[in-house]
Amino acid sequence: MTHQVATCHKKQSFSGKPTLSRIALLVALQISASALPISITHAEEQADESITVYGQANEAYAAGKISKASSIGMLGDKDFLDTPFNAIGYTDKHIQDQHAQDISDVISASDPSVFTSGETGLNKESFKIRGFSSDIGDVMFNGLYGIAPYYRSSPEMYQRIDVLKGPASLLNGMPPNGSVGGSINLVTKRAQEAPITSFTGTYMSDSQFGGHIDIGRRFGENEQFGVRFNGVFRDGDASVDGQSRKAQLASLSLDWRNDIALIEADLYFSTERVDGPNRGLSIASGVDVPSPPSSDTLLSPSWAYNDSEDKGMMIRAELDLSNSVTAYGAVGASRTDFDSNVPQRVKIIDDSGTLEVSLGSVKLESKRTSGEVGIRSSFDTGPIEHYLVLNSTYFREDKNDSPTGNNNPGSWNPNIYNPVWGPEDSTYDNYYELPVDSTQISFGVADTLSLANGKYQVTLGLRHQSIDYESGVTWNGNAFPTTKLKESTYTPAIVALYKVSDSVSLYGNYTEGLTNGKTAGSGAANVGEAFEPQKTKQTEAGLKLDMNDFAHTFSLFEIKKPNGYQDPDTNIYSFGGEQRNRGIEWGFYGTVLEDYTLTGGIAYTDAEITKATDVTTEGKQATKLPDLQAKLALEWNLPVMRQLTLIGQANYMSEQYIDAQNTQSLSAQTIFDLGARYNSTIANQSVIWRLAVNNVTDEAYWTTTHYASLALGAPRTVMLSATADF
């Protein structure tokens, strides 16, 4: 078995000798560092396997949309049946076919375990995995936290987007923002063996036009040098009246390889400007959820804006020390500058839909460094094969958030059915400075023990995670005491897999995730007490079925996440609160009867508050989450016209509660999408035409949102693209 690097690229064998498993060069983790999963040959008996292709993508299901392998953190890439987790990898073909403009578009299209609101104009990507919020700032870039764009990431520079469901601190270390529902890894494009030059022109209603150029080449006597460039520009009006968006991206990927070493570098620069952004609405207690207005209504002033700029870079290296030992290391840095002027809080205050508005602005600057070093080795002890991994991760963020607010223009009195807003106002009553300096360091070890050529596999692992956190608050020039936290903890994992046959695997795991601890506030009897990183604990069992062109994953899970809790009797603050999510998932993807491709599934998640400061909410369902999601995407390649593929998709979400007492809720919805794809040849050049009409019935519906309780779902949106290969 060969474990691959997260980028799915293998070094080319030039001499005819067996290719050694790649290993990253040990990069000193001094001031900053950064990391990625790497590949190594699992056992020396495989040493005669010569790999002669570099940069070739893994085999894929669903007509090339779903990779048969995905990155599993420090364990490297694993094939579908060898992965003891519920994981999925989306290829660049899926990204293109989905007309995706961010990561949420990719991972939520047909996966029922992932929930996104569907609203437009939010300043950041927002999604939930297995019922828990996952912060876009916790997305990994080639295995490193903190390198990807901070608020939104254009997906055109990625070869693959991997999603691993459930907490995974052993595999990746503690996410900077404490996401525990799952982890996402963005794998950048590399130059392939064959040169690539393609241009994609895009249109999205009402009048947003754009282009994407993708160029890749290899150079040198043995094609040891690789260059891949991606450039993106989009600008124009969105499908919501009064809302527009402009996005730019330039990314460059470089690599060099020989028989035993690999060096890769990535650089990118991206910007986004949204005019008429939308943070959503809250609703006053006792007010019924009103009927939604027209689907293209902008519930925010058109003069409001979000403006962000991201830049990042990383270098990684791998070196084969022997046939069975690989060393790896990576280092990266990124910076985000964000500026916003938008209503911070908009509340529905009566049954007629009247809005109460508080304005505010935000300026944010975030600088991040990240890294990883490690060693992977394979060896045998009698009949047992070992795959041993040691690694250390590092992450630091220096952030300054400068919000303003509390300007309440009461004379406006907008209404959701007639949202008339006053002129732009930047005179605010309150000014804040919220600096944060956070450093996270971890050391992890994992040993995968295999018997009978991998039929029986058990992975035992442990990670030590430390965090050094300091934050401050300045309000209208008045400084408040600094909050300091310096704590550490251990997170174990036990994972097992049994390959029943060449097409069936059973797996189970116990894993933990970490969220930053806090200090007890001024209202607590134990004010100032610091708490270590808090552990979210998962137990999971599942079955995987590989029917060559069609795959299924069935899983059962329970996740318990601690929440802040202040004892009503003693007034002592702790993390004694708890949310418990229990769920069952069925996901499938593949080709059926040659002409049909199916992707989708069903997920039921019972998210219950089991202990809370307000005891009346115990036993209630967690808010802003449908307990049932069902998704199905069908593609039909017409037998009478093989160049044409017709596409249909349906997404169902059940009722969602938006208040802790479960008295206010949003009704269940089913959204339908239609599309088509046509392969043509023009002037001897391949041209692929893609058409999508999302929310084809133009359903007006409420959905939940990251910052507030509810927001309008996206209206009917038409997207068209044409990709020409030169």
Swiss-Prot record:
Q: Effect of altering residue 178 to A?
A: No change in Vmax. 3-fold increase in Km for ferric-anguibactin
Principal subcellular localization: membrane
Listed A to Z, the keywords are:
Cell outer membrane, Ion transport, Iron, Iron transport, Membrane, Plasmid, Receptor, Signal, TonB box, Transmembrane, Transmembrane beta strand, Transport
User: What changes when the gene is disrupted?
Assistant: Mutants are unable to grow under iron-limiting conditions in the presence of anguibactin.
Top-rank taxon of the source lineage equals: Bacteria
Give the residue ranges of motif TonB box.
49-56
Q: Name one GO cellular component term.
A: cell outer membrane
- Swiss-Prot/TrEMBL induction comment: Induced by iron-limiting conditions.
Does this entry carry the keyword Signal? yes
Locate the TBDR beta-barrel domain: which residues?
Answer: 194-726
Give start and end of each TBDR plug domain: 79-189
Per its database record, what is this protein's job?
Answer: Involved in the uptake of iron in complex with the siderophore anguibactin. Binds and transports ferric-anguibactin from the cell surface to the periplasm.
The record's similarity note reads: Belongs to the TonB-dependent receptor family.
Name this polypeptide is given: Ferric-anguibactin receptor FatA
What species was this sequence derived from? Vibrio anguillarum (strain ATCC 68554 / 775) (Listonella anguillarum)
